[in-house]
Every structure is written in C-alpha cells, then in structure tokens.
C-alpha cells in the first residue's frame, strides 16, 4: 500500500485510528521498565554502584551466570533494515519501526518475552552480519524481520553458524509454519490430498520460498508448484539471472503469467503485493479452492471479492479484521 494510494472510507477510518493509537497516550507501543524495587537508597546501591560490581565479577568468572543475574535469557532483538516489509516493500529502517515495535508487543503479550526492536541503516549483508553478531552478549535470541531476499537467506545462515544463541528468521520460519498449518487444515476441510493439489504462488521472496520448502516436505509435489515473481512465472526458459532459491522452483511449462499459473490451481499462496489476484483469476481455479492471501496490510485479494467470485473458496489473509487470519 503506497502512501498516496486512494483509500476507501473504511481504510481512511482505519488509518486515522491506527495513527492515533500509535501517538496517544504515549508515543509508540513499547517501553523499558525496571523489574526490581527502586524505592530507597539501598535498592539503588544494589541496582547500580557499588552492589552491581558483584554480579559483574561473577559473570566475568562464569559467563553462564549472565542468564541468572541479567535479563539476557528472556531478551530477544527484533532486527530489520526495512528492505522487505510485507505489503509495504522497501520502506527503510525508520519507517519500519512501528512494525518492529508491533512484533515486540506480540512477543511480550503472548509469550512473556522481552524485546528490543533494532532498525539498522545498513544494506550490505556482510556488514549486517558483523553488526548483529556483535550484539550477542546482550541477547538471548535474534529474530530477523523484513530483510529482502536473497540476502536474508545468507544472513540467517551465517548468523546461525556463528552465534551461540538462537537465530530465527520470522519471514521464513514463522510464515512457513503458520501457512503450512493452514494448508493442511484447508485441504482437510475440502477433502483434497496434498500430493495431488496444484499450487500457484505469487511472490518468490524469503516468505514464499520458505513456505514452499516446508510444503514440499509435507507432500506437495514440486512439479505441481508454479511460482511467479515480478517478471512472471519462474520457468525453465527464463534468461534473467535467478538466485539459487528461485532456481529450485523453475518449471518446464508454457505458463508465463500469474493468471496462467492460477488457472486450475487448487491452492493460491500469496506473499507478494496488494490486489495481484483478481476475481477473474479466482474464477478459473479448481473446485473449492484454498486462497492464502498473506500480503499485509492489504492482501492479494480481499475476502469479499474472492467470495463473490467463488462462493466455494476458503480464503485466509494476514489481517486480524477478517476470519482465518494466517500470518507470522
């Protein structure tokens, strides 16, 4: 969704409410609060100098004690450079901060995990790796978020090998887990076998490729998967340079457009951009199609549009204001 896109009355109301929510009564959505009493001189002497020296010395002698004497064990960094924010694109690190704060809210509310959101003004993958790896003493885990493909695959792989704390790439692992669960449940509802379905995909970034890798592991046949990037179907006759992740899903096919790929498909997986799946495309899908339109905040097709075109479809989006929310 671009900032100059014409909004419906409902979207204008949502925009105004969201902006007000983020601005008042305090700016932003997260804060840092002490977990120990600070009510008198003794508390202050224990929290800082001179008492703080003793846990410092203990950790110097035995680094594992950092998990006893500091918040490290329950502290995760949500880290981005803002190059691939789902549904918004390359909006940069500063504009992505509300998304990272929002993810921090979810960690705290639903898992009790504390979060620092870290937005980095750096696009070079190797420099990002150095910066993030240097944060290891502070953190109990890393959650990579909204970093564009194919760099994100390299960054996650290098950090996982280098760091001694968990490194989770949300757009790969989180989206893959939840969308695969939706696929299994959706196919069960319509009585289709996973090894027989045709899957059309819009998007070939980190989220889409990770979803496909898991779905193939669950039984989707690779020859039944048709992936589209910004240039159309990823087919064997493409002359442009494809990264390794896209090459795995090249098809020997005459299909060239998303409309071609969607024709006769049992499942649509969208990890791309608003409005790319049209009602006319949905009409050409197989009986009881499953539509996973996961672009946020605006899906590849609105549920009401999909349902009007195909009343027999099951549609899920990444939005919380529609039924069947499927996102990471």
Language-model regions: role of each:
Residues 2-167:
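N-terminal ligand-binding/catalytic initiation module
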Residues 56-57, 69, 86-89, 210, ...:
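Short helix/loop capping segments that flank catalytic or ligand/cofactor-binding pockets
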Residues 81-83, 91, 120-121, 146-149, ...:
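Short, ordered loop/turn segments at secondary-structure junctions
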Residues 86, 93-111, 169, 173, ...:
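Glycine-rich phosphate/diphosphate-binding loop of Rossmann-like nucleotide-binding domains
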Residues 117, 143-146, 167-170, 201, ...:
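General beta-strand structural signal in soluble alpha/beta enzymes
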Residues 136, 194, 261-262, 282-285:
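A short, aliphatic-rich alpha-helical micro-motif
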Residues 157, 275-327:
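Rossmann-fold NAD(P)-binding glycine/threonine-rich loop
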